[in-house]
From Swiss-Prot:
Entry note about domains: The PPC domain mediates interactions between AHL proteins.
Known role: Transcription factor that specifically binds AT-rich DNA sequences related to the nuclear matrix attachment regions (MARs).
The species this protein was found in: Arabidopsis thaliana (Mouse-ear cress)
Top-level division of the source organism's lineage: Eukaryota
Domain PPC as annotated: residue spans: 80-230
Protein name (Swiss-Prot/TrEMBL): AT-hook motif nuclear-localized protein 17
C-alpha cells in the first residue's frame, strides 16, 4: 500500500545514516513528543550541538493574585446601659405603689422613682414620731402629687449573701386648701386620675456595709487618743439643755396627734386686706 511504501522508504533512509546521527534523530523525536504534551524545563541537544530550553509553567494562579488572607471580623455588641429611663402611666383607680412593684417583678429589675405627677385619693402615711412608731394616719380627699421618691430593689439571686433591703415610697402632697403633707406611704396609694411616674431602672446593685472594718479600727484608735485629752469646759450643760428644749419643740408634728385624717385642723389661709 501507499502508506506502507512510504514507511519502508523512511526506514531505508534512516538505515543509510550513520549510527550516531540515527540515535540523535531518535532522541530529538522523543523530546519533541514529550515537550508537546508536557512543558518541562529540559535541555534538548540538536544535530549542531545546540540546546533548546523548555520552561514548564506552574499550575494555578500566581501567589498574591487572589485569595488573599482577610483580616478577622470582630462582631461587637452594644452592652446594656447601667440605667434606663422609664415613663410609667398608672390609670385612675389603681394602686400606684403596687403597680410599680408588679412592673419590677415582671421585668426583674430595680427601679428608682425620680418624680411623679397626677392626683391621688385617701392617702395613708406612717407616723414619723419615734413615740408613735408603727402607727399610721389616713387623709381622706383628693391630693396632688408634688414629689415622689421611691426605690424598688430587684430580687437578689439565691447565691447572693447580701442582706435584704426593704423598699420605701415617700410622697409630698398638696391638699385642696393649699396644705402640704408628706411622709412614708403605709397603705394603698390610689390614683384619682392618670398618674405619670418618671423612673430609672438598674440591675445588679452592689451592697457595702459602712463603715468598713478598717475604718472602724481606725476610728477606735483615734477615739482612744482623743479620750486621753482633758475635757473642754464652756457651758456644755446649758447648750445641752437648749438643744433638748429645741428638739422637743421641733419634734411636734401634725402626724403625732390622735385625730383622724378628716379631723386634722389646717391653718387658715391669709386673706387679702379689704380695699379702702
Amino acid at each position: 500500500m501507499k502508506g506502507e511504501y512510504r514507511e519502508q522508504k523512511s526506514n531505508e533512509m534512516f538505515s543509510k545514516l550513520p549510527h550516531h546521527q540515527q540515535q540523535q534523530q531518535q532522541q530529538q523525536q522523543q523530546h519533541s513528543l514529550t515537550s508537546h504534551f508536557h512543558l518541562s524545563s529540559t535541555v534538548t541537544p540538536t544535530v549542531d550541538d545546540s540546546s533548546i530550553e523548555v520552561v514548564r509553567r506552574p499550575r494555578g494562579r500566581p501567589p498574591g493574585s487572589k485569595n488573599k488572607p482577610k483580616p478577622p471580623v470582630f462582631v461587637t455588641r452594644d452592652t446594656d446601659p447601667p440605667m434606663s429611663p422609664y415613663i410609667l402611666e398608672v390609670p385612675s383607680g389603681n394602686d400606684v405603689v403596687e403597680a410599680i412593684n408588679r412592673f419590677c417583678r415582671r421585668k426583674s429589675i430595680g427601679v428608682c422613682v425620680l418624680s411623679g405627677s397626677g392626683s391621688v385619693a385617701n392617702v395613708t402615711l406612717r407616723q414619723p414620731s419615734p413615740a408613735a412608731l408603727g402607727s399610721t394616719i389616713t387623709f381622706h380627699g383628693k391630693f396632688d402629687l408634688l414629689s415622689v421618691s421611691a426605690t424598688f430593689l430587684p430580687p437578689p439571686p439565691r447565691t447572693s449573701l447580701s442582706p435584704p433591703v426593704s423598699n420605701f415610697f415617700t410622697v409630698s402632697l398638696a391638699g385642696p386648701q393649699g396644705q402640704i403633707i408628706g411622709g412614708f406611704v403605709a397603705g394603698p396609694l390610689i390614683s384619682a386620675g392618670t398618674v405619670y411616674v418618671i423612673a430609672a431602672s438598674f440591675n445588679n446593685p452592689s451592697y457595702h456595709r459602712l463603715p468598713a472594718e478598717e475604718e472602724q479600727k481606725h476610728s477606735a484608735g483615734t477615739g482612744e487618743r482623743e479620750g486621753q485629752s482633758p475635757p473642754v469646759s464652756g457651758g456644755g450643760e446649758e447648750s445641752g439643755q437648749m438643744a433638748g428644749s429645741g428638739g422637743e419643740s421641733c419634734g411636734v408634728s401634725m402626724y403625732s396627734c390622735h385625730m383622724g385624717g378628716s379631723d386634722v385642723i389646717w391653718a387658715p389661709t391669709a386673706r387679702a386686706p379689704p380695699p379702702y
